[in-house]
Amino acid sequence: MVLFIISSNAYALEPGKWSFVQEDEYCYIGSLATETDLPENKIRGDNYILVYRIIGSNQNIVQIEAGYNYNTEKNILVKIDNTDFDFYTVEDSPDSAWTDDDNKVIYAMKKGLSLIITGESSRGTITNDSYSLNGFTAAFNDLMNECK
């Protein structure tokens, strides 16, 4: 597992838009949440979702960044339209989450309209982040065609 941490400002990720970025060793597509229900008195860092690929690899990996440390004892729920997927986090990078079903998640993202991530912080705060999947398929096609 490779951990990618980017600044959403550095690569101009936008809410509701899927952006393609190519670097020397990897490429990714990403988006910011269109809506989040974090309580007003809580603070968090950048939160976004990526699909990345190492150049020369044929593996596409879905990664979520929460902007806070997840509760490592609980799964993160990703709901794409009416289908649920479990993501997990690890102690070495508690603000990130992955799945063992990347291809299934990507397939659902290509077919879906919306994605909602429900996670619990290490302090017990539950968040729901909503993402639009409009434009995901076009961005994913760029990833597949340009990142070889």
Predicted region positions:
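N-terminal signal peptide c-region/cleavage motif recognized by signal peptidases
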Residues: 5-9
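A generic "folded-domain core" signal
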Residues: 11-148
